[in-house]
Amino acid sequence: RDAYLLTMQMWHEETVTIIEQGKQAGEFTFTANATDIAWRLIALVCGLDGMYVLGIPEMADPAFKYHLDRMITLELFA
């Protein structure tokens, strides 16, 4: 459990860094908090991954990519 928590925190920190660097470079146009955006993106990936592993047909590769791309667009280019 501790290793999982550490990995999740590291993933979050790296995602926040990427989001903030993208905003500073003018690549992203969001107004929300980068920390919150990172948690929402991670939560989406974890949820989609669970559905994918369960073999839910609606979550095959194309759908997984579509939903992730859609959320990234909504979060980072708002």
Predicted regions mapped to residue ranges:
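C-terminal peripheral helix-coil segments that are non-catalytic and often amphipathic
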Residues: 12-25, 35, 42-44, 50, ...
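Short secondary-structure transition hinges
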Residues: 1-16
